Amino acid sequence: MERPAAGEIDANKCDHLSRGEEGTGDLETSPVGSLADLPFAAVDIQDDCGLPDVPQGNVPQGNPKRSKENRGDRNDHVKKRKKAKKDYQPNYFLSIPITNKKITAGIKVLQNSILRQDNRLTKAMVGDGSFHITLLVMQLLNEDEVNIGTDALLELKPFVEEILEGKHLTLPFHGIGTFQGQVGFVKLADGDHVSALLEIAETAKRTFQEKGILAGESRTFKPHLTFMKLSKAPMLWKKGVRKIEPGLYEQFIDHRFGEEILYQIDLCSMLKKKQSNGYYHCESSIVIGEKDRKEPEDAELVRLSKRLVENAVLKAVQQYLEETQNKKQPGEGNSVKAEEGDRNGDGSDNNRK
């Protein structure tokens, strides 16, 4: 699925990626649905989101009226579940950012190679800063649900670390694939890392669903790194571009792009304004492994900046107080002298008298 990538350990930590704004066009001209323009590949919004069924306990036979009421309650609940699944349209996702420069540089070479063969595909390319793996998609409808999602992400952290057993999870990327010729992606190579990532994805889905969040897809989770999708450029359909031709990327079929180490998972918005570097808006992030024991550089810079500002403010306040005191002191001296003058004047008058 497509993505946005890593977020802030507060909201600004996702700045390590850049991406251009995805254009929105007349989606009726595209073979892919409107959801295809979001950072995941053709999500099936009719999936089973894991909503619990109403218990089907035995109803006492001696109370047919109550039995009828129970059946009515169950029917209402089923209708609500069906409506919830029908209205399910993910707008947030968990992202694993791709920050290895070897991987991102290799993807740029791939994209440029494709564009040299067909420059009509320019707008179908994913921006430099948006390369990622989408771990989970979800629907968060308001600020309260976003806060619940943030809590769920924090709860996910120890589960992920337990799955990894203190080891790094290395994700090697090798070769090219497509989803029905509409979405082009770099493949995640086979290996034990795949089962670990699948377990993390399933754990994330369960963690968010247990908090009442609509999350996940009906299709099997297939981790991938999207580099282009035709739905980003609906006009291509009118120009006769129906699919991504294999010949465009054939020389990269067996290319090894590099390895990414999982160190961060971000909760990102698909719809909020992207960051200045092109990366998706991040609500929160968790860091995994050694980098969690060492404070991130960005966070350290923020901390240092705050200290510098606090010191500057404190110094300014102290300077102001000193200047204020200095201004008062001459005035106080003049008052004393004036009082002494008054007393002396009174004495002179008395002498005259």
From Swiss-Prot:
GO terms for biological process: action potential; cAMP/PKA signal transduction; cellular response to cAMP; modulation of chemical synaptic transmission; positive regulation of potassium ion transmembrane transport; regulation of membrane repolarization. CMP binds at residues 134, 224-226. It holds the Pfam family AKAP7_NLS. Residues 301-314 are annotated as: RII-binding. InterPro entries: AKAP7-like_phosphoesterase (IPR019510), AKAP7_isoform_gamma (IPR052641), AKAP7_RI-RII-bd_dom (IPR019511), Cyclic_Pdiesterase (IPR009097). Residues 1-33, 47-85, 321-353 are annotated as: Disordered. Signal peptide: none annotated. GO terms for cellular component: apical plasma membrane; cytosol; exocytic vesicle; hippocampal mossy fiber to CA3 synapse; lateral plasma membrane; nucleus; protein-containing complex; sarcoplasmic reticulum. Expressed highly in the heart, and moderately in brain, lung, liver, kidney and testis. Hardly detectable in spleen and skeletal muscle. In kidney, isoform Delta is expressed in the principal cells of the IMCD. Residues 299-353 are annotated as: PKA-RII-alpha subunit binding domain. AMP binds at residues 134, 224-226. Residues 300-324 are annotated as: RI-alpha-binding. Keywords: Cell membrane, Cytoplasm, Membrane, Nucleus. Residues 1-22, 66-76, 337-353 have a biased composition (Basic and acidic residues). GO terms for molecular function: AMP binding; protein domain specific binding; protein kinase A binding; protein kinase A regulatory subunit binding; protein kinase binding. Binds cAMP-dependent protein kinase (PKA). Interacts with PRKCA; only the cytoplasmic form is capable of interacting with PRKCA. Probably targets cAMP-dependent protein kinase (PKA) to the cellular membrane or cytoskeletal structures. The membrane-associated form reduces epithelial sodium channel (ENaC) activity, whereas the free cytoplasmic form may negatively regulate ENaC channel feedback inhibition by intracellular sodium. Isoform Delta may be involved in shuttling aquaporin-2 (AQP2) to the plasma membrane. This is A-kinase anchor protein 7 isoforms delta and gamma.
